[in-house]
Amino acid sequence: MKTKILALSAISAACLMMMSTAMAEDAPAVVADPGPVTANVTLASEYRYRGIAQTNSKPAIQGGFDYAHESGFYVGNWNSSISWVSDTYQGANPVVSAPIEMDFYAGFKKEVTEGVTLDGGVLQYYYPTSNLPTTAGNPNTTEVYAAGTYSFATLKYSYSLSDLFGQLGSKGSSYVDLALNYDTGVEGIVLNAHVGYQKVAGSANPNSSYTDWKLGLTKDLGHGMNVAVAYIGTNADGTVAFYQSPTGQNLGRGTGLISFTKAF
């Protein structure tokens, strides 16, 4: 689950993803030497996606690969350690195992005029699981997305073609977000700001929709490396099972995060 939260790179030189990404979906990618194939690896204090904790306040390791053709076509894979699926069904017998998220995406991104770039594609979130209860929703999710970037601002819209991350009856959910990544011109520091709204469809999910936000800084360390810090929060209803930890804490509560990324 990307976005692209804590800015963690699932984005290549030609692919802005959400995916967001710990501080994922709206941070600038760390880009190594330009080329058709790039890779990235990230260590994060926590993985948050659309403001919701995916690792229950624990660190995450993440990484991915991207191929970008000069025509604008791109395809890629991004992966992260997670705990939210097994946490959601804690107490189930036998124990649910779902330690990893695997994202597969493809799309087309092109500068249509000076300073204006359009991007569109499809994203599959895949969660290899075992012992998932038969009554549980399938966490695997398919979304299509469209985005436009002007200068340092990106507006993106995502629409789910399946139920959203296991919430039954939520097909047709949508997420819209605005990300600002402003180069301060000071010592390789970029100011990151983000606000998004997750609309969860279906009458069975009346309290699942919420707003999330982020404010942070990314520092270019050179040699394809960066460090990012951010404060992330949401107004998600902590009584909703998908937003509640096994100990009853709100998984969307405000928190500070830090991540280190290396691009190849």
Label for each model-derived stretch:
Residues 1-36:
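Cleavable N-terminal export/targeting peptides
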Residues 25-84, 89, 255:
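Short glycine/proline- and aromatic-enriched beta-strand/turn motifs that initiate or cap beta-hairpins
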Residues 37, 71-75, 114-118, 152-157, ...:
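Repeated loop/turn-to-beta-strand initiation elements of outer-membrane beta-barrel proteins
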Residues 43-49, 69, 79-83, 124-128, ...:
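Transmembrane beta-strands of outer-membrane beta-barrel pores
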Residues 57-61, 98-102, 138-144, 149-151, ...:
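Residues that define the transmembrane beta-barrel architecture of outer-membrane proteins
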Residues 64-66, 105-108, 121, 145-147, ...:
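Outer-membrane beta-barrel architecture
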Residues 73-138:
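Surface-exposed loop and membrane-interface regions of Gram-negative outer-membrane beta-barrel proteins
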Residues 215, 219, 248-264:
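Outer-membrane beta-barrel "beta-signal"
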